[in-house]
C-alpha cells in the first residue's frame, strides 16, 4: 500500500462525512433508510464477484449466513430506537435517532475493502486461497447485514405506524420544522 489513488482519499472523506451526519437525529422519508443498504449489497456483490471470480457456492453461502447474522444484529439494535412519526404535505416522515454505528460500519468496510484489494493487488499467497475468499464474503455479509437489518426494522415500524398498529404509541409526534 505504498501509493493509494486520490479517489480513495476522497471516498474515505465522503464515508466519514456520511457517517458523522448519521450521528445526529434526522428526519427522513420511510424509504430512505433502506436505499443505502440496497446499494451496499449491489456494489459489494459486484466487487466481490470481480475480485474472486473463482469463488464457489461456499463463499456465497458464507456471505448469506453472515448477512443473515448481521441483519439480525442490526434488527435488534434498531429495535430499541424510539422513532417519531409525522405526516406532512410531503408524506410520512420518521425521525431517526443519532447513531454512530453506521460510522463504525462504514469505516470497518473501508478498512476491510482496502485490505482485501491490497492483498490481491500485491499477490499475497494467502489471498489466492479459497479460505480468504470465504472470509472476505463473510466479512462483507456481516458489514452489509447490520445496516440492512436496522433499515428493515425502521421500514417495518413505519408501515405498522401507517396502518395504525404501531408500538410507538408512547413516542410523541415531533414538531414540524
What are these regions (language model features)?
Residues 1-13, 61-68:
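Structural signature of hydrophobic alpha-helical transmembrane segments
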Residues 57-72, 137-142:
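Alpha-helical transmembrane segments
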Residues 102-177:
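C-terminal membrane-adjacent module
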Residues 28-41, 58-66, 92:
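Cytoplasmic-side transmembrane-helix entry/capping segments in multi-pass membrane proteins
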Residues 6, 33-38, 75-78, 98-112:
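Select subsegments of transmembrane alpha-helices in polytopic membrane proteins
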Residues 15-29, 75-87, 151-157:
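C-terminal ends of transmembrane helices
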Residues 52-58, 78-91:
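A cytosolic-side transmembrane-helix exit/cap motif
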Residues 1-3, 49-61, 123-134:
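Helix-coil boundary and interhelical linker segments in multi-pass alpha-helical membrane proteins
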Amino acid at each position: 500500500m505504498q501509493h493509494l489513488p486520490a479517489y480513495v482519499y476522497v471516498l474515505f472523506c465522503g464515508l466519514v462525512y456520511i457517517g458523522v451526519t448519521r450521528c445526529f437525529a434526522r428526519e427522513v422519508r420511510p424509504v430512505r433508510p433502506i436505499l443505502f443498504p440496497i446499494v451496499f449489497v449491489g456494489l459489494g456483490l459486484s466487487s466481490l464477484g470481480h475480485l474472486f471470480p473463482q469463488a464457489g457456492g461456499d463463499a456465497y453461502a458464507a456471505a448469506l449466513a453472515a448477512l443473515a447474522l448481521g441483519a439480525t444484529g442490526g434488527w435488534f439494535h434498531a429495535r430499541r430506537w424510539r422513532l417519531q412519526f409525522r405526516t406532512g404535505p410531503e408524506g410520512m416522515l420518521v425521525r431517526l435517532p443519532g447513531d454512530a454505528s453506521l460510522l463504525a460500519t462504514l469505516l470497518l468496510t473501508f478498512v476491510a475493502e482496502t485490505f482485501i484489494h491490497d492483498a490481491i493487488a500485491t499477490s499475497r499467497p494467502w489471498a489466492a486461497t479459497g479460505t480468504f475468499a470465504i472470509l472476505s464474503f463473510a466479512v462483507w455479509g456481516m458489514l452489509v447485514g447490520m445496516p440492512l437489518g436496522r433499515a428493515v426494522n425502521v421500514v417495518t415500524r413505519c408501515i405498522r405506524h401507517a396502518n395504525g398498529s404501531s408500538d410507538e404509541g408512547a413516542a410523541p409526534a415531533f414538531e414540524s420544522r
